[in-house]
UniProtKB/Swiss-Prot annotation:
Belongs to the Tom22 family. It comes from the Eukaryota. The keyword Transmembrane applies. Residues 111-144 are mitochondrial intermembrane. GO terms for biological process: intracellular protein transport; protein import into mitochondrial matrix. Keywords: Membrane, Mitochondrion, Mitochondrion outer membrane, Protein transport, Receptor, Translocation, Transmembrane, Transmembrane helix, Transport. The chain crosses the membrane at residues 92-110. The gene is tom22. GO terms for cellular component: mitochondrial outer membrane translocase complex. Coiled coil: none annotated. This is Mitochondrial import receptor subunit tom22.
Length: 144
């Protein structure tokens, strides 16, 4: 029996490989062109899109369990800050009214004490002036 064997020319193999490579490069180049076209179409509506639309689109990205956790955390933080603000307001009310009820009478008594001290000093100065004018004489207006 006779065996047939095909002898392949090396130049033919190289030419075929080169055409395959050229076809692949052409296909890749075509895909790049199509991809760049789709990239441009991705940016077409961005100028009309608002920040609210973008935030609403995040709803689709974030899973439900995470959204629930985030909402619960925000609610807890809001409640805590609200209670802290209420406590701060009530504390300021107590401190300010206490300062007024206790501080004003105290300041008035200090002022009265200062006036009394000033009056006593004036009396001593008058006595000293009388002693210089008439040594040993007593004044009828001021008791000794």
């Amino acid at each position: 029996m006779v065996k047939l064997e095909e002898v392949v020319d090396e130049t033919e193999v190289q030419n075929e490989q080169q055409t395959v490579i050229e076809k692949d490069q052409y296909i890749y180049a075509q895909e790049d062109v199509e991809e760049s076209d789709s990239d441009e179409s991705d940016f077409e509506g961005l100028e009309e899109e608002t920040i609210i639309d973008r935030i609403a689109a995040l709803k689709e990205i974030v899973p439900v369990t995470w959204r629930v956790k985030i909402a619960d955390g925000a609610k807890t933080a809001t409640t805590g800050l609200s209670k802290l603000a209420q406590f701060g307001g009530k504390s300021m009310w107590v401190i300010s009214t206490s300062a007024l009820l206790l501080g004003v009478p105290f300041m008035m008594s200090l002022e009265e004490e200062a006036q009394l001290t000033e009056y006593e000093k004036q009396i001593k100065d008058q006595r000293g002036a009388n002693e210089v004018i008439a040594p040993g004489a007593t004044s009828g207006a001021l008791p000794q």
